Amino acid sequence: MERAPPDGLMNASGTLAGEAAAAGGARGFSAAWTAVLAALMALLIVATVLGNALVMLAFVADSSLRTQNNFFLLNLAISDFLVGAFCIPLYVPYVLTGRWTFGRGLCKLWLVVDYLLCASSVFNIVLISYDRFLSVTRAVSYRAQQGDTRRAVRKMALVWVLAFLLYGPAILSWEYLSGGSSIPEGHCYAEFFYNWYFLITASTLEFFTPFLSVTFFNLSIYLNIQRRTRLRLDGGREAGPEPPPDAQPSPPPAPPSCWGCWPKGHGEAMPLHRYGVGEAGPGVEAGEAALGGGSGGGAAASPTSSSGSSSRGTERPRSLKRGSKPSASSASLEKRMKMVSQSITQRFRLSRDKKVAKSLAIIVSIFGLCWAPYTLLMIIRAACHGRCIPDYWYETSFWLLWANSAVNPVLYPLCHYSFRRAFTKLLCPQKLKVQPHGSLEQCWK
């Protein structure tokens, strides 16, 4: 997001003299430094373009990603991709030579697109945070709206409209309203660059309000998860069934890992809410064993039933055979099985929500780290008209801001199992076919 002429970085004196620009922008870099900076900028461009292109290709390759909340991640990837494909490449020769050589018309277009994309990235992060907030605090109504793709598209379009309205009209019309352009020949930056009142208003809408919003959403998610965890633990102590003294101890089903998948050794395991109460799914056997499964329903099992359990897992009571009437003990067992199923399902959902809060905290923290320096320096610089902030600090701050577009796609495979699996499908399709459960870890090593 280029907001200033780069002469302060190019010229040893740090002045914005029009004579230097007219002379071609004397560079303050040696040939070696120019090569190093060009290589770093090229690396940032490649990382931004390839990373976000991979996110977009994942939507084409994996139809399971096309949910409402993931459409917002796609919208963010489109913004970041265009930053790397259009905004940064046009700025590289400008920052290395100190002179804009692409004409006034392309300068206007570049500024509009640059401000638009960076603002849309911010608003997309707010939208993603709000969507996760609804998924945790209003889960029932949220799940009912998951199939409404048009609602998601409307929200995505609204993000782009608001992002354009924030800076676009000002960039296009400022020079006509003020009676002429104040930008020297060979430079390209917004006319309002030193207007403190406009910048403080725009910064409030572009950074301070969004940052407070995502902080509120994530704090609400965290508090909601904490409350639900506390209620689950209290409920387990009050109403949890006691296993019989002769029952064999069995570890509970492993919760999802931080990647959202089962650990090694549990490749076939699935949460119990995928099965009916009357079906024996993975994890039910462990629950039955912990609760003392068998016809005795709490009494010592006979040698026959004990050996049968050891060889075939926990069996259903004989009274549950087809055509027979369930006994009181079998009804009690079914009730306890249902309680175990509900407990494991709730534990799975809490683990999923904790993962959501963790991933959002990472995204928001990086967002604040990348945007706060630029926003604060922009306001201070405008207040003192560029005399109190060294130009290289300002230059560094918005390169840090651009780096956020390269970092965002890295967060998806780290925090979202669905994206990680889609990336594996694109990058390691053979491993995914041969080892569908264990290939994710191997592919990303």
Curated annotation (Swiss-Prot):
Biased composition (Gly residues) is annotated at 290-299
The miscellaneous remark of the record is: Proxyfan acts as a potent neutral antagonist while thioperamide, ciproxifan and FUB465 act as potent inverse agonists.
Localization (cell) = Cell membrane
Q: Residue spans with biased composition (Low complexity)?
A: 300-312
Q: What is the protein's given name?
A: Histamine H3 receptor
Report the glycosylation sites. N11
Its gene is Hrh3
Q: Spell out which residues lie on the membrane's Extracellular side.
A: 1-39, 92-108, 178-196, 381-396
Main localization (coarse): membrane
Q: How does it sit in the bilayer?
A: Multi-pass membrane protein
Q: Where is this region: Disordered?
A: 234-259, 286-336
Q: Which InterPro entries match?
A: 7tmA_HRH3 (IPR041998), GPCR_Rhodpsn (IPR000276), GPCR_Rhodpsn_7TM (IPR017452), Histamine_H3_rcpt (IPR003980)
Is the keyword Amino-acid biosynthesis in the record? no
- List-wise, which residues carry Phosphoserine? S439
Q: What does this protein do?
A: The H3 subclass of histamine receptors could mediate the histamine signals in CNS and peripheral nervous system. Signals through the inhibition of adenylate cyclase and displays high constitutive activity (spontaneous activity in the absence of agonist).
* One Pfam family from the record: 7tm_1
**Where is the chain membrane-spanning?**
40-60, 71-91, 109-129, 157-177, 197-217, 360-380, 397-417
Which GO terms label this protein's molecular function in UniProt?
amine binding; heterocyclic compound binding; histamine receptor activity; neurotransmitter receptor activity
> Mind telling me which CDD domains this protein's record contains?
7tmA_Histamine_H3R
Tissue specificity:
Expressed abundantly in brain, most notably throughout the thalamus, the ventromedial hypothalamus and the caudate nucleus. Isoform 1 is largely predominant in all tissues.
Q: State any GO BP term from the record.
A: positive regulation of cytosolic calcium ion concentration
- A Gene Ontology term for the protein's cellular component: dendrite
Where in the chain are disulfide-linked cysteines found? C107-C188
The organism's taxonomy opens as: Eukaryota, Metazoa, Chordata, Craniata, Vertebrata
Q: Which residues lie on this side of the membrane: Cytoplasmic?
A: 61-70, 130-156, 218-359, 418-445
Q: Biased-composition ranges for Pro residues?
A: 241-256
Keywords in alphabetical order, please.
Cell membrane, Disulfide bond, G-protein coupled receptor, Glycoprotein, Membrane, Phosphoprotein, Receptor, Transducer, Transmembrane, Transmembrane helix
Family membership: Belongs to the G-protein coupled receptor 1 family.
